[in-house]
Design a protein with these regions (language model features):
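Hydrophobic helix-and-loop "lid/oligomerization" segment in the mid-to-C-terminal part
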Residues: 2-27, 35-65, 80-85, 164-291, ...
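A generic local secondary-structure boundary/capping motif
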Residues: 75-78, 99-102, 126-129, 147-149, ...
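Short glycine-rich anion-binding loops that position phosphate/pyrophosphate groups of nucleotides
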Residues: 28-29, 91-94, 116-118, 233-234, ...
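Short, hinge-like loop/turn segments at secondary-structure boundaries
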Residues: 41, 68-73, 105, 128-131, ...
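Short glycine/serine/threonine-rich phosphate/pyrophosphate-binding segments
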Residues: 31-37, 94-98
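An acidic intrinsically disordered interaction segment
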Residues: 1-9, 103-110, 131-139
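Active-site cofactor/cluster-binding pocket
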Residues: 70, 76-124
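Short alpha-helices
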Residues: 113-181
Length: 329
């Protein structure tokens, strides 16, 4: 088995020898996917590489005004020649690359950089560390092996990546190395207070309207350990809300005293729901989500299920209650 350090070196070597590189994040891009991709892209461009930044879905507004280079991210690969290397950032499931999945067989080399459990090795180099709380940590380590300086722009992107995927450093996966990396990033002079205000205190009013509608659906189980909420597409349409305006809602039920497991059901389109799972202490929600074709981390995961909301909720709530009983012993 190839060691982690050898994998990092192999990835650095492949990137160093390539002239043109495509970097792609996952559908419904978040701060870790975008921040990690942009940090790596800025670093590679400083090495003289031709870099194409790709996202299957639009970049949320809150990141466009915050992350350097975010306005350069494209939804299509608009070049006559396919780049030599394709790097999947924060994603090790081909379907989560959206329409870019269909281009994978056209690249000479494919690198996967991820930290989600249950991924698939669909590339030539598979750098997946499920112990890392964010892909941004892995990218930071990778940059130590490349001839680049971590400047303010790169540091800002990595700070956003790690900050957002660790719940502002509140989640279980945060480790001493996380804070050491953050210290290194802060030493470049990034405006940490300003970044956090823009991430968490500059939301459009529609976000609060969405939250208000979602909170009306809050349901806590008789045992007090399971809480769930949902939002349907017709409600989002009535509020003129986009999917990005729902981000962060998932964690609200978990803040209730005594609740171990939180579920959030979001209608994506007709009869397709994204279910987000969050746990506090002991329920392995990666295992729970895998029962429905999904996955993620022990304390945060998700899946997509097709059907009627009432049936999906009943099925998943039943499975969640079983998990609470079995894993709480």
């Amino acid at each position: 088995m190839t060691s982690r350090s050898d994998l990092l070196s192999a990835v650095a070597d492949m990137l160093s020898t390539a002239d043109s590189i495509a970097l792609c994040g996952h559908v419904m891009p978040d701060g870790d996917s975008l921040g990690s991709m942009l940090a790596l892209g800025l670093a590679l461009r400083s090495m003289g590489k031709q870099v194409h930044l790709l996202s299957p879905d639009p970049v949320p507004d809150q990141y466009l005004g915050l992350l350097p280079g975010a306005d350069d991210i494209k939804s299509e690969l608009q070049v006559p020649d396919i780049p030599e290397i394709f790097v999947s950032v924060d994603c090790s499931v081909p379907d989560r690359l959206g329409h870019f999945k269909t281009l994978l067989n056209r690249f000479g080399g494919i690198i996967i950089i991820d930290h989600h459990a249950g991924g698939v090795n669909f590339g030539h180099l598979y750098l997946n560390d499920a112990q890392a709380p964010a892909a941004g940590e892995i990218v930071f380590e990778l940059l130590q092996l490349l001839p680049v300086d971590i400047n303010v722009d790169i540091a800002l992107c990595l700070y956003v990546a790690i900050n957002t995927d660790t719940g502002s450093f509140r989640y279980d996966g945060v480790r001493p190395a996380t804070h050491r990396i953050i210290a290194r990033l802060m030493e470049t002079g990034i405006p940490v207070s300003q970044i956090n205000k823009q991430l968490y205190e500059e939301k459009p009013v529609v976000c609060l309207k969405v939250l208000g509608e979602v909170l009306k659906t809050l349901d806590v189980s008789p045992c007090g350990k399971l809480a769930s909420m949902y939002i349907e597409r017709n409600t989002l349409n009535r509020l003129n809300a986009r999917d990005e305006h729902v981000d962060g809602v998932t964690n609200y039920p978990r803040t209730i005293k005594g609740v171990e497991l939180a579920l959030f059901f979001r209608e994506m389109d007709d009869k397709r729901f994204k279910i987000s799972f969050r746990s506090k202490h002991f329920v392995d929600v990666n295992k729970l989500a895998s029962q429905f074709g999904g996955g993620g981390h022990q304390r945060a995961s998700g899946c997509i299920v097709e059907g009627k909301l009432v049936d999906i909720r009943r099925q998943i709530v039943d499975a969640a209650l079983i998990a609470l009983e079995e894993e709480g012993k």
